[in-house]
């Protein structure tokens, strides 16, 4: 059984309220089976604008890694793809613009915000809620703080919130699994 079809580049998925949020650039959709036939009956575009302004997308830079955070928000990374994200059908919530950032959203209120990160290929949390990201050049980094807190002080110029933490150095061999 195919739960959902006609998705453009689905690269992220997370469960919520009997359905799933799916990241399919430039949209985040909500899909749900409402009649028990294991096929999506409800299909709703919730957010749009992630990479939507680009004429050509880089396959290595698509949104990915939907994860639940300890803050009860769904977190993801937009990789290197810029965004001007808005909630479909709710213009009063405005637009959130970003470049090379991660993001999170509250699935109940649809509050969307920028998060520190900018992972290319992955993002996850450990059991203590610490955030880790990776890319080709930096195969494991820890996100030490959220930029929005440091940015509140105009007299403080913080270092990058990303810290390389691999024991084998900043760049290691990358072994592709896909054909």
Model-derived regions, located:
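Beta-propeller domains with acidic blade repeats across secreted/periplasmic ectodomains
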Residues: 1-179
């Amino acid at each position: 059984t195919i739960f959902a079809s006609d998705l453009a580049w689905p690269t992220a998925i997370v469960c919520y309220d009997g359905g799933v949020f799916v990241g399919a650039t430039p949209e985040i959709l909500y899909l749900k089976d409402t009649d028990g036939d294991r096929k999506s009956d409800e299909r709703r575009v919730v957010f749009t604008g992630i990479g939507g302004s680009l004429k050509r997308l880089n396959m290595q830079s698509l949104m990915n890694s939907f994860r639940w955070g300890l803050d009860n928000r769904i977190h993801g990374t937009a990789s290197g793809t810029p965004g001007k994200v808005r909630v479909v059908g709710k213009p009063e919530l405005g637009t959130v613009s970003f470049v090379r950032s991660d993001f999170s959203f509250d699935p109940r209120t649809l509050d969307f915000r920028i998060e520190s990160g900018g992972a290319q290929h992955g993002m996850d949390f450990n059991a203590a809620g610490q955030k880790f990201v990776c890319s080709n050049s930096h195969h494991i980094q820890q996100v030490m703080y959220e930029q929005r807190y440091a940015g509140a002080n105009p007299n403080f110029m913080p270092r990058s919130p990303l810290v390389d933490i691999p024991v084998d150095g900043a760049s290691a061999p990358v072994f592709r699994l896909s054909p």
